[in-house]
Amino acid sequence: FIVDNLVPYLSEVYSVDSSNLTLTGHSLGGYFGFFALFNSDTIGKNLFRNYYIGSPSMQAYTGLYDAYDYEEAYFSRKSNLDSNVYVTVGSEESQGFCMPIEMFIKTIQERSYSGLSLEYEVIEGYDHNTVFKPSIKNTLLKYYGKQ
């Protein structure tokens, strides 16, 4: 839907720079962001250059695969990942929630994908429900540079 319907529609209605699109997701949407990133060569047609992945729910049970499976499958196909990825959590989120995210970030970093710019940030003073606002502001400034 996003690739085949939403982005083409938005491109018709608005002035869209198709070379610098950003996919954003928070919580389960953040988990989906990892899915989209590691399937970008097959499903997403490399549509998105930037990804904001906020407080991804790594404990999500999909019934099939988890984020590690998607990443492993991608790595078996490719060694480059031409994307900018900004992952955030709030400092007030539980360690049990954040630890799987940090472990997954470490796995990605150890792959040394060429073309990947990966930034992980813990935003002080925010929890799972409040970290989205400062995170999306940071994302827009990073990828579009305007206030």
How should each PLM-predicted stretch be described?
Residues 1-147:
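Non-catalytic cap/lid and distal C-terminal segments of serine-dependent acyl enzymes
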